[in-house]
């Protein structure tokens, strides 16, 4: 049976929708990812973020390897119905695979001629300690 709420989302030609993940409380933007219908449905069912991994071509339950799960408080759809916003609690304060709080840790500084990207967030945990495979 088709779920009306899933049909309201404007999925792209690949059946995906962009997702912005924002931390409840701080309002920090933690990451950007994609979901397909199954990922969005699983997110609602679990109360935890589940995305579509374009590189692995499979569902990706955020934190499945690292333990850095995202507990979902709200799911919003933008005015054009083609972008999803998740408001989450980030477990262990690490959202990025680099071991940082946010994937947006590089800030542009300077001007058009001599500007450059500066790292403005510290590594909270070495990724080698996060992603250990037996």
From Swiss-Prot:
Group of enzyme by EC: hydrolase
EC id: 3.5.4.19
Cofactor remark from the record: Binds 1 Mg(2+) ion per subunit. Binds 1 zinc ion per subunit.
InterPro entries listed in its UniProt record: PRA-CH, PRib_AMP_CycHydrolase_dom, PRib_AMP_CycHydrolase_sf
Pfam families tied to this protein: PRA-CH
Subcellular location(s) per record: Cytoplasm
Catalytic reaction equation(s): 1-(5-phospho-beta-D-ribosyl)-5'-AMP + H2O = 1-(5-phospho-beta-D-ribosyl)-5-[(5-phospho-beta-D-ribosylamino)methylideneamino]imidazole-4-carboxamide
An individual GO BP term: L-histidine biosynthetic process
Cofactor: Mg(2+); Zn(2+)
Pathway: Amino-acid biosynthesis; L-histidine biosynthesis; L-histidine from 5-phospho-alpha-D-ribose 1-diphosphate: step 3/9
Function: Catalyzes the hydrolysis of the adenine ring of phosphoribosyl-AMP.
NCBIfam families named in the record: PRK00051.1 (NF000768)
Subunit structure: Homodimer.
Family: Belongs to the PRA-CH family.
The protein, known as: Phosphoribosyl-AMP cyclohydrolase
Record organism: Cupriavidus necator (strain ATCC 17699 / DSM 428 / KCTC 22496 / NCIMB 10442 / H16 / Stanier 337) (Ralstonia eutropha)
Organismal lineage: Bacteria, Pseudomonadati, Pseudomonadota, Betaproteobacteria, Burkholderiales
Gene: hisI
């Amino acid at each position: 049976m088709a779920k009306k709420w899933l049909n309201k989302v404007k999925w792209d030609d690949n059946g995906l929708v962009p997702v912005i993940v924002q931390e409840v409380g701080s309002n920090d933007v933690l990451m950007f990812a994609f979901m397909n219908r199954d990922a969005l449905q699983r997110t609602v069912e679990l109360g935890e973020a589940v995305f579509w991994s374009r590189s692995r071509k499979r569902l990706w339950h955020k934190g499945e390897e690292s333990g850095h799960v995202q507990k979902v408080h709200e799911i919003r759809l933008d005015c054009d119905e083609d972008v999803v916003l998740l408001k989450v609690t980030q477990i262990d304060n690490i959202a990025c695979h680099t071991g940082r709080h946010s994937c947006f840790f590089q800030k542009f500084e300077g001007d058009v001629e001599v500007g450059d990207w500066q790292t403005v967030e510290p590594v909270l945990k070495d990724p080698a300690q996060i992603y250990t495979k037996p």
